[in-house]
Amino acid sequence: GSGLVGSEMCIRDRWSVTTTVTSNGSVNGMHDSTMPLSGMVEMLNMQINTWFGGVGVGWLNYYTFIIMAVFISGLMVGRTPEFLGKKVEAREMKIATFVALLHPFVILVFTAISSYVYTHHPDFVESEGGWLNNLGFHGLSEQLYEYTSSAANNGSGFEGLGDNTYFWNWTCGIVLILSRFIPIVGQVAIAGLLAQKKFIPESAGTLKTDTVTFAVMTFAVIFIVAALSFFPVHALSTIAEHLSL
C-alpha cells in the first residue's frame, strides 16, 4: 500500500518514533509516505515535546508539567504544593502555564496563517512554486508537520511540502525562535524563583511526588494540556484523512 512508499523495511517505524520523540530529525524513510495515523503519532511526539527531552535543554518541558501537576494535585487534596522541598506558588504556576500553552499556540497560529495565505493568496503561493503537492487533508498535515518540527527543534518534515521558499524559511525561523528561547527563559525563571525560597523539610502535609498516583496525575496534565490542544487540527487533517481511505 501507500504506506510502503519511501520506506526502509527493517526499523523505519521504530526510527520514525525515536527521531520525533527527541530533537533528532534524521529519517530512514519518508514520513510523508506513512499512513495518516502514523503521521499523527510522529507529530504528537513533537507536539507534546516532553517525553525524552531535547538536545541542549534536557527535560525542561517535562519539569514544567511537573510544576503544573504539583500545584493542581496540591489544590485537589488540600496539601501544600511542594517540589524538591520548595513551595510551588502562583508565580511559578503562571509561568509554567504560559510556557506549556505557548508551544501549541505558536504551531496552530502559524498553521492557520499558512492555510489562509494558501487559500486567499494563490498568486503569491504560485510565485513560490505552489507549496503543496498534496491537497485536502494531507496538505493541511504537511503544513502542520512543518511548523511542529520547527517548534520542537526537530528538523524532519513531510517532504511533499515545497518549503524552501521565503515564506516558509522566514515563518519557520520565527516559530523556532519563539518556541525554543521563550520557554527556556520561563523555565529558568521558575528555577530562579524556587532557588530563592527556603527549603521546607518533608512533613505529613507534603504532597509526595514519588508515587504512582502522582505519575498518573502528571501524565493526565500532559495529555490534557499538550495532546488535546492539537485534537481539533488533527481531526481536520490526519484523522479525517484516515477515515477517508
Predicted regions and their residues:
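Juxtamembrane boundary at the C-terminal end of a transmembrane helix
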Residues: 229-245
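Short amphipathic alpha-helical coupling elements at transmembrane boundaries
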Residues: 16-19, 42, 46, 82-90
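Hydrophobic core segments of alpha-helical transmembrane domains in multi-pass membrane transport
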Residues: 65-74, 100-115, 188-192, 217-229
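Pore domain of cation channels
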Residues: 30-77, 160-195
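Single conserved hydrophobic/aromatic residue that forms the stacking wall/gate
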Residues: 1-6, 11
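Alpha-helical transmembrane segments
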Residues: 75-89, 189-210
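Alpha-helical transmembrane segments and their helix-start/interface "positive-inside/aromatic belt" motifs
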Residues: 88-103, 209-221
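Extended, low-charge hydrophobic alpha-helical regions
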Residues: 108, 112-160, 164, 171-177, ...
